[in-house]
Amino acid sequence: MAKFTPASLPAEFLDTMRDIMPSSLSMEDFIAACQRPLRRSIRVNTLKISVDAFLQLAQPYGWQLEPIPWCQEGFWLLNAEEENTRLGNTLEHLSGLFYIQEASSMLPASALFHHNDAPGTILDVAAAPGSKTTQIAARLNNEGAIVANEYSASRVKVLHANISRCGVSNTAITHFDGRVFGAALPEYFDAILLDAPCSGEGVVRKDPAAMSHWSQESITDIAATQRDLILSAFHALKPGGVMIYSTCTLNRQENQQVCRWLQAQFPDACEFESLDDLFAGAERATTEEGFLHVFPQIYDSEGFFVARLRKTGSVPPLPRPGYKVGKFPFSPVAHKDRALLTEAARKQGIRWDEELLQLWQRDSEVWLFPAALTSAFGNIKFSRIGIKLAERFPKGFRWQHEAIVALADPNASNAYALNDRIACEWFQGKDSYPEPLPTADELILTYQNTPVGLAKRISSRIKNSLPRDLVRDGASSARPLAKE
């Protein structure tokens, strides 16, 4: 494991923390926590495997897993520094069975579903790399719909890769400045998660360089952007809907003051909802407003802030955007073709709920779009919607990797379970020569009963068809090496 270099904390930052630190906490503990390495943590992806099944699977690995109190699917991996294998290259991670996610960043999605709220259409304003989007999708069990927005072009590809790896089917990706949604989709979303860009004061344990450009001036600029984002998000939220505002920073200017500013704009339409009962021990981090202000020493985690706001009534709309979205490039698949496509997919072992996902087409491409989002088509431009199911050819369909990962039946007649050795070869982009040979010519490959791809058997060889951008030369099992 790389040597940990503690962060250098600016004196002005420490003075700010000293001024806002609750009397129940000490600066000495705060500084000590900031200068310790961050505990590794993972979240079980219940779209692929149950928590109980994952714990049983992980038993032989020697992992010491401690439950994270605010996320039933989350665990601290206490002996991560003893592991020689990088978690991200394990077969279990590449197969989407778990997501490497910092424990504190699991708080916003947990707060969104507090009191078992199950909103239908959700906006994730700043979604990359996808940890919270995939957590929300798992809580929804791929029902409803999520718009996952990312402003940074370089991070959109990573966002899609993580959504695909985790088998998420109910999500559309957009690439906008988050300030557009209030005008473009007024009062459209049942719930919104705004994990706002921030000064990053809480991440020094993971990124000691995070404080290298810290200044009060930059915080003032960032807070202005946050106010713009939360205002737009509030306009995009339905009356009665819930918004989670979160940051990975600690100062009040980017946290409490942003939330209070929004409430001051709409005193009759914005209420704060307390998170003091979100989990056992939450009161240790709860502010007088009911926000969670998580200093790193409280739970031995990253510093974090989470607020839950309720929109209690309509507000005057923003001016409609002046730009034109352009013609929507997809059209619904005709009824006759739908039946043909659905039957062909089922023969291949691919199934979906036709009430949740609908067939659309563009030229030779066939897609499955979340039904809950159809009213948004034509109002904003999407970078990607749902799942690319197939490409049409004169002699049939070429089924797409992401459709197999999300929708294939691991118990289909053409499914073939990979052992650790062949699964490593698959993710390394290599052909395999398995024994015994599979009988089918076109195979749904599975690992730990989860689909990982589609391949053809050619004589005694499984031809590797994993998309090149998913190949990992270092792919390896988390299982201790043993004879197969």
Swiss-Prot record:
<dbReference type="Pfam" id="PF01189">
    <property type="entry name" value="Methyltr_RsmB-F"/>
</dbReference>
<feature type="binding site">
    <location>
        <begin position="126"/>
        <end position="132"/>
    </location>
    <ligand>
        <name>S-adenosyl-L-methionine</name>
    </ligand>
</feature>
<feature type="binding site">
    <location>
        <position position="195"/>
    </location>
    <ligand>
        <name>S-adenosyl-L-methionine</name>
    </ligand>
</feature>
<comment type="similarity">
    <text>Belongs to the class I-like SAM-binding methyltransferase superfamily. RsmB/NOP family.</text>
</comment>
<dbReference type="InterPro" id="IPR029063">
    <property type="entry name" value="SAM-dependent_MTases_sf"/>
</dbReference>
<keyword id="KW-0808">Transferase</keyword>
<dbReference type="Pfam" id="PF17125">
    <property type="entry name" value="Methyltr_RsmF_N"/>
</dbReference>
<dbReference type="InterPro" id="IPR049560">
    <property type="entry name" value="MeTrfase_RsmB-F_NOP2_cat"/>
</dbReference>
<keyword id="KW-0694">RNA-binding</keyword>
<dbReference type="GO" id="GO:0005737">
    <property type="term" value="C:cytoplasm"/>
</dbReference>
<dbReference type="InterPro" id="IPR001678">
    <property type="entry name" value="MeTrfase_RsmB-F_NOP2_dom"/>
</dbReference>
<protein>
    <recommendedName>
        <fullName>Ribosomal RNA small subunit methyltransferase F</fullName>
        <ecNumber>2.1.1.178</ecNumber>
    </recommendedName>
</protein>
<keyword id="KW-0963">Cytoplasm</keyword>
<dbReference type="InterPro" id="IPR027391">
    <property type="entry name" value="Nol1_Nop2_Fmu_2"/>
</dbReference>
<dbReference type="Pfam" id="PF21150">
    <property type="entry name" value="YebU_pre-PUA_dom"/>
</dbReference>
<dbReference type="GO" id="GO:0009383">
    <property type="term" value="F:rRNA (cytosine-C5-)-methyltransferase activity"/>
</dbReference>
<dbReference type="InterPro" id="IPR031341">
    <property type="entry name" value="Methyltr_RsmF_N"/>
</dbReference>
<keyword id="KW-0949">S-adenosyl-L-methionine</keyword>
<feature type="active site" description="Nucleophile">
    <location>
        <position position="248"/>
    </location>
</feature>
<keyword id="KW-0489">Methyltransferase</keyword>
<dbReference type="Pfam" id="PF13636">
    <property type="entry name" value="Methyltranf_PUA"/>
</dbReference>
<dbReference type="InterPro" id="IPR048457">
    <property type="entry name" value="YebU_pre-PUA_dom"/>
</dbReference>
<dbReference type="GO" id="GO:0003723">
    <property type="term" value="F:RNA binding"/>
</dbReference>
<dbReference type="InterPro" id="IPR011023">
    <property type="entry name" value="Nop2p"/>
</dbReference>
<dbReference type="InterPro" id="IPR018314">
    <property type="entry name" value="RsmB/NOL1/NOP2-like_CS"/>
</dbReference>
<keyword id="KW-0698">rRNA processing</keyword>
<feature type="binding site">
    <location>
        <position position="177"/>
    </location>
    <ligand>
        <name>S-adenosyl-L-methionine</name>
    </ligand>
</feature>
<dbReference type="GO" id="GO:0070475">
    <property type="term" value="P:rRNA base methylation"/>
</dbReference>
<dbReference type="InterPro" id="IPR023545">
    <property type="entry name" value="rRNA_ssu_MeTfrase_F"/>
</dbReference>
<dbReference type="InterPro" id="IPR023267">
    <property type="entry name" value="RCMT"/>
</dbReference>
<comment type="function">
    <text>Specifically methylates the cytosine at position 1407 (m5C1407) of 16S rRNA.</text>
</comment>
<feature type="binding site">
    <location>
        <position position="150"/>
    </location>
    <ligand>
        <name>S-adenosyl-L-methionine</name>
    </ligand>
</feature>
